Amino acid sequence: MFQPAAKRGFTIESLVAKDGGTGGSPGSGGAGSHPLAVAASEEPLRPTALNYPHPSAAETAFVSGFPAAAAAGAGRSLYGGPELVFPEAMNHPALTVHPAHQLGSSSLQPPHSFFSAQHRDPLHFYPWVLRNRFFGHRFQASDVPQDGLLLHGPFARKPKRIRTAFSPSQLLRLERAFEKNHYVVGAERKQLAGSLSLSETQVKVWFQNRRTKYKRQKLEEEGPESEQKKKGSHHINRWRIATKQANGEDIDVTSND
């Protein structure tokens, strides 16, 4: 069976005295010097992460391969922009890079990083991307043409038509023309538009709306009973045609008998 190795006991005073006796000069006191004096002459204690030597050329080349330049061993972010570097880490005395390593890293640093200033310019997209309604709002107004999202694309919305405000005299003339004829086309519409200082499109739209209103008012005046009579008479006429009967006495289609 393996036997556990004997533990070695030592104290801080013995280590300090040993280092002072072997590394010191003959006139510095040697092994008989005071432990506090020897400790004061030593290099101040640092955390373990700060006691590493300067990076080698291979390490510097590895770091310089990333978008960020190897100007510092730590405190440098992945992006190469100077605004993303921590100022506390750059000013720390233990994180400075040796001049020789700076020269080596400058030759190995890529010429352009992805996040450099030239890549921050407005991106150029294909026209079909800009015309798409679902992607156009994600880009800035400077990148998107003004007519790219309104007049193009299968789902683009047409601009709303401005409603014309007619004067009382124009409405009176239009109503009189509608009483004479519900459809005004050709030279008659052109003459009416010229006399009212309107365009032919405005006159055409007004007549379309007026015909729709007229049909709706007519249906409201007749009521549901007249509509039922029309449907009943239609079925009776079809029955008479099918049975080849002459028009005799009228049949009341609204009776409940």
UniProtKB/Swiss-Prot annotation:
Q: Which keywords has UniProt assigned to this entry?
A: Developmental protein, DNA-binding, Homeobox, Nucleus
Q: How does it assemble?
A: Interacts with WRD11 (via the N-terminal and the central portion of the protein); the interaction associates EMX1 with GLI3.
Composition-biased stretches (Basic and acidic residues): 217-230
Q: Which domain of life is it from?
A: Eukaryota
Give a short account of what the protein does. Transcription factor, which in cooperation with EMX2, acts to generate the boundary between the roof and archipallium in the developing brain. May function in combinations with OTX1/2 to specify cell fates in the developing central nervous system.
Similarity field:
Belongs to the EMX homeobox family.
| Residues covered by region (Disordered) | 216-257
What is its subcellular localisation?
Answer: Nucleus
Q: Which residues cross the membrane?
A: none
Q: Does the keyword Cytoplasm apply?
A: no
Q: Does the keyword DNA-binding apply?
A: yes
The name this protein carries in UniProt is: Homeobox protein EMX1
Per UniProt, what is one GO molecular function of this protein?
Answer: DNA-binding transcription factor activity, RNA polymerase II-specific
Q: Check the record and name the InterPro entries matching this protein.
A: EMX-VAX-Noto_Homeobox_TFs, HD, HD_metazoa, Homeobox_CS, Homeodomain-like_sf
Annotated GO biological process: brain development; brain morphogenesis; cerebral cortex development; cerebral cortex neuron differentiation; cerebral cortex regionalization; homeostasis of number of cells; in utero embryonic development; neuroepithelial cell differentiation
Q: Which cysteines are joined by disulfide bonds?
A: none
Gene assigned in the entry? Emx1
State the CDD domains in the record.
homeodomain (cd00086)
Binding region for DNA: 159-218
